[in-house]
């Protein structure tokens, strides 16, 4: 378990005892991304921000966004090690509490209801393609400055 936890950056380690194969995961509410290695993603799109999706008030658009990300997860690593991306570190569901929020582009709206509805549709779309999601940043992620000094924000969200 220590190995699974300590070495699980952007993937889930294989656990032979229970028959779990290694699973590739990636970040990016606006598409597949990895700030640690910018060359990991081939032929995948950068999408619009979550805020723009929410301004449409259109659940179908959010669902299609999720489906497209799911499709890209399956084929997006074909020029890399040929392993699909099965887990997506998104969507971000915090709300816009301040215009100075460092990650507002990752969140849908200041309206919690709208944010939840749009996130649910995006998740349904992505899951329908066999890619699971890690809903992130429920709260306590209002700034980027000094965010990692204590590390609490990352674990709480």
Regions found by a protein language model. Give the residues of each.
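Glycoside hydrolase catalytic-domain context in secreted enzymes
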Residues: 1-157
